[in-house]
A protein has these predicted regions:
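Active-site signature of alpha/beta-hydrolase-fold catalytic machinery across serine-
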Residues: 81, 176, 202-207
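Glycine-rich His-Gly loop
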Residues: 68-72, 193-194, 231
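Glycine-rich nucleophile elbow surrounding the catalytic serine of serine-hydrolase chemistry
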Residues: 192-202
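Short, surface-exposed "cap/lid" segments of acyl-processing enzymes
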Residues: 56-128, 133-134
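Alpha/beta-hydrolase active-site loop
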Residues: 123-180
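A catalytic-pocket lid/entrance helix-loop region that shapes and gates access to the active site
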Residues: 204-253
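Alpha/beta-hydrolase fold nucleophile elbow
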Residues: 181-194
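N-terminal cap/lid segment of alpha/beta-hydrolase-fold proteins
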Residues: 3-58
């Protein structure tokens, strides 16, 4: 059909991927956190919280820390481009004082059962057939064979990796990197993309000690604000109110 408007002029690029990579680093980190065995034993990999840390290579004290959760079909690495560009832009801006940002992107615990061997090898080789052969044709990679796709009966322990696990994992990452509660209130932000943005709102209202008479442990008491990407919400004080319009990059602080 007809385009709704004429194409816009191409925006001049003022930096390259190499510029960003020279300034910003991405690190894969883990926190030991034994998973529940209530519904059966779990693989050793599931006893770790997995996440990525994005920060300036010089590793200065951050002015702000963003803890982000991915959408329903994504993992923590989905934030790689956004996090790096955001950190670079904040540090190199000329219209105001540079900011030192840090981004922590947290995987949901059930990502621990993923076998990314074929996908990683295909990406490195720039050949999708490598992944197809590994996952569907029984071709090993570095001596490793794909163990097959799992059914629910194979992974009963996933029943314990629900909403509470997500909240506890994100809180553990946040408090590990920003241990001072006052610092968290001043410079830590919780957020996410799509479903991850919804989970950010859940975090803000989560009661971490299970005692409704205490408030210091509540999620909203441990962050300076909430950031949402590709999401919308309805104000809690009105069931009749229409959701606020969502934008492609929308933040609520």
């Amino acid at each position: 059909g007809t385009l709704p408007e004429p194409p816009k002029a191409r925006v001049a690029v003022d930096h390259s991927t190499a510029d960003v990579d020279a300034l910003v680093e991405q690190r894969f980190l883990q926190l030991a956190s034994p998973a529940s065995t209530f519904n059966g034993p779990v693989p050793a990999a599931c006893d770790q919280i997995q996440y990525y840390q994005f920060r300036l290579r010089s590793a200065p004290e951050p002015d702000a820390v963003l803890v982000l959760m991915p959408g329903v079909y994504s993992g923590a690495n989905v934030f790689s481009y956004l996090a790096k560009e955001l950190i670079y832009a904040a540090h190199t801006r000329t219209d105001a004082a540079p900011l030192n940002l840090e981004v922590l992107a947290v995987d949901r615990r059930d990502n621990c059962i993923e076998d990314l061997t074929g996908l990683n090898a295909a990406e490195q080789a720039r050949d999708t057939q490598v992944a197809l052969d590994y996952y569907f044709n029984g071709v090993p990679l570095d001596g490793q064979l794909f163990d097959g796709f799992k059914s629910s009966d194979d992974v009963p322990y996933l029943s314990e990796m629900g909403l509470a696990q997500v909240m506890e994992d994100v809180h553990a990452v946040l408090t590990t990197h920003v241990p001072d509660p006052l610092q968290r209130q001043q410079k830590a932000f919780i957020g996410g993309h799509s479903m991850g943005a919804s989970l950010a709102w859940v975090y803000a209202g989560w009661d971490f000690d299970g005692d409704e008479t205490t408030l210091a442990d509540a999620g909203y008491q441990n962050v300076a604000g909430v950031i949402r990407l590709d999401s919308r919400y309805t104000p809690a004080d009105s069931q009749e109110a229409a959701p606020l319009p969502a934008t492609e990059n929308d933040a609520v602080i």
